[in-house]
Amino acid sequence: MSSWNELLAQPAQPLTTTQLAVGFVAPISDQGLIALDGEESASFLHNQLTNDVEHLGLGEVRLAGYCSPKGRLLASFLMWRNETTIFLQLPREIQAPVQKRLAMFVLRAKTKLSDASESPAHQVVLGLGGGMAEEALQNWFDPLPAKPFSKVDHPLGTLIRVADAFGAPRYQWLMSAEVAQTVAPELAAKLSVGRTDAWHLSEIHAGIPQITKATQEQFVPQMINFELLGAVNFKKGCYPGQEIVARSQYLGKLKRRTTLVSIADAAAAAGVEVFATADPEQPCGMVVNAAPNGKGGIDALVEMKLAAIEAASVRLGSAGGAPLTFLDMPYVLDPLDL
């Protein structure tokens, strides 16, 4: 393998969770990046997103949501900063409209939004995880980010540690094409090479949902476990939809969560509804994210009623569709009376 282009070439078959757990590297090619520059960038975003931006440290990474006035998620972000810029990572398919909407509210704030997806420093994004990923990365990084949702900035790029999966750390490495050309052969020699869907499969098994075009305005943050993941700060000031998000938390009316399932149906995809066999006439939830599991089926994060999770008899698409096999989540689904 002589170049990073060859590393990013798509392998014929998706990786299995067993392969991911051992160690993998995969291109993350479907994510966009919004950059905000200017002295009021943090205060502007603080008034738009569900999480605290004003106190975001240089070594920190946070999840955050961007809601409609009705409290429904328009986007979810992975968010970090350097000395001058705040970055918001989100699916490329929704980046342009979300960036345009955010820009509408800048008004007189001293901040400028731009598309950083193709900037030289972020031209290549690789996802790594599994038991062998740490050792592979130690060839270039010392120390590695110490805990989930932390990062290090390095001459070779930005290394972000995200939520663990399969009992091992996972990382995103944002780098230039020149760096990728150097490191790709070594990574590919030590780790299983996956497609972008391998990264999404690892995200699903980490219990990290992401809003895509198919699921915009479908969920209040708590429905996809966002407050359990530290993505909602209930002490911060107002943002679009804040009153509804707070009411959902403290009045306990949602009674819904997102959980991990496996489905022996390759048609499972974000936005597809699911049905409880006990109540076949109306959907009990919706697929949030899905990825091939290397065994001919799909693993997915599915939002649904707590009663349906407890009954564990749910089908895809209709009450007669493919059954959902419920898997253990990597964190406790504390109902919080939702």
Residue ranges, per PLM feature:
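Acidic, proline/glycine-enriched N-terminal capping motif
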Residues: M1-L63, C67-L74
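Anionic-ligand-binding alpha/beta catalytic cores of soluble enzymes and soluble regulatory domains
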Residues: Q172-S262
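Residue-level recognition of beta-strand microenvironments
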Residues: A116, V162, G207, G237, ...
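Short, surface-exposed ligand-recognition loops at beta-strand->loop->(often short) alpha-helix junctions
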Residues: A35-S41, L128-M132, S262-A269
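Acidic, low-complexity central loop/insert segments
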Residues: F24-A26, G32-L33, L78-A206
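Short amphipathic beta-strand starts and helix->beta connectors
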Residues: Q13-A21, R62-S76, V106-A109, V152-I160, ...
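Glycine-centered loop/turn motifs
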Residues: G59-E60, L144-D153, A267-V274, A312
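Glycine-rich, small/acidic residue-mixed loop/short-helix segments
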Residues: I224-A231, A246-L338
